[in-house]
Amino acid sequence: MQVRWAPSDGSLGDYTYQQDMSSSDKLSADDVLNTLDKSNRHILTCILVCGLAWSPLAFTGLCPSFVVKASENSSFIGVADEFDLTGDASWLAESTTTFYMVGNMIGGMFIPPLADHYGRLPVFVATVLLMAVGGMISAFSTSIMMFCIMRMIHGIFYTAAGLAGWVLGYENTPLRLRFFTSVYFGVMWVVGACFLGLLAYILPDWRYLMFCISVPNIFVALLIYMTVPESLHFLVSSQQNEKIEAWLEKIRGPKGDISASDIVEDRDENGSSFKTLCREMWKHKMFIVYVLVMTYIWIVDTFIYFGLAFYSTNLAGNLYLNFVLMSLVEAPAYIFSPIFMNKYGRKVLISGTHIIAGLSFLGIVLSSEAWHIHFWLLGKFAISCSFMSIYMFASEIFPTDGRNKCIGFCETLSRFGGMLSPYLSHLTAVHALAPAITLSLIAVSGGLLTLILPETLNTKLPSTIAETASRRQLIDDKSDSSSN
């Protein structure tokens, strides 16, 4: 039996079912998932629970907005207040976020391979639990250095939990539900961010806040362990036939017509060795340009996104309301970005949203203070659209034989933008509008550089670096032939 799911019109999320019976054919894990009904309760539970974990992840990633140093007009007690980090020592408060981003880089490099070896589920559960423990211990820090170290540990497990949770949920999702899965994960992040603002209002002390935002991870980890199955893709790739049979019986029912022997591993995702990849890149210099441009865009988006999140509590007005509004504006970005990408193209959307963000920040410089919050919100919406889209764009630009390595390279280096983001507020010492001017210039530069990249809408995924490097010419040839 052969099962295929193909886009009926080239768009994401719109798939037509085609089945061709042939007993000699083998199925991939995706083929098996696509035979499941979209209302399958086990799959829906997996999606809902894995996405639910992103709410407490938002607690961890965005808590510096309050914990480090809240607005001077606020009664919130942050680490800068408790440890008297003022004057020449004020930089130590922001360094807690730098330590956190360093932890992100470490976790991103060393823990994902454990998920490939031991499984997505155990790594997901373990890292979520360790996040809870690390967060609760950090609430009892006796010095700023102890807090920095605990934040770095937090960062290590945050990245691993986020990646493992996303991969586990995505790999257990049929193709026709992956659009919904992407939107749901993003919305749950927004829900977590909004709850963080509410908790900070109720608990205006960094110790109480850190402890309370860490506890939910314990319950989430237990819920994951009790309800979420291991990734079928992982079980197939590791050839665990007994567990595959158990997975099939649980998810598809005891009377299913597919067995472990019918499923084969899709091996084209393993990619080339690092040495081979470097050799191919040297042959095709344009591909190196694509990697550098994509890395720069990733750094820009990380810097602006976290910079806005952390800086929102320094804006005029109620810091809690400002933070919640900055978070809520992400929800429509996560919902509409995939639609805009399929209608106007990846490059147009990402370049355009960077330009819109840049103009929004420029509007802050040119307008009265009453309009500032509106321009900040528009800028946050635009950069959230780009951040949502860049993962798909990168997956379609980078070829199969180097996709994981290239995306990992971009993701890791993007944390340098995260390291710099907490220092955005320090630019007010130069001029009150210096943060807005800086963000505007950086956003516009990212938008203009995006134009160097090839459009990937309605094109098949490249298999080799040579295909990616020549893609611009291929698209030009295709457009010329269609016009004739």
From Swiss-Prot:
PROSITE patterns: MFS. Coiled coil: none annotated. This is Putative transporter B0252.3. It holds the Pfam family Sugar_tr. Keywords: Membrane, Transmembrane, Transmembrane helix, Transport. The lineage of its organism: Eukaryota, Metazoa, Ecdysozoa, Nematoda, Chromadorea. One of its GO terms (cellular component) is membrane. The chain crosses the membrane at residues 43-63, 95-115, 121-141, 144-164, 183-203, 208-228, 286-306, 321-341, 348-368, 373-393, 433-453. It is found in: Membrane. Its main location: membrane. InterPro entries: MFS_dom, MFS_sugar_transport-like, MFS_trans_sf. It comes from the Eukaryota. It comes from Caenorhabditis elegans. The keyword Membrane applies. One of its GO terms (molecular function) is transmembrane transporter activity. Belongs to the major facilitator superfamily. Sugar transporter (TC 2.A.1.1) family. It is a multi-pass membrane protein.
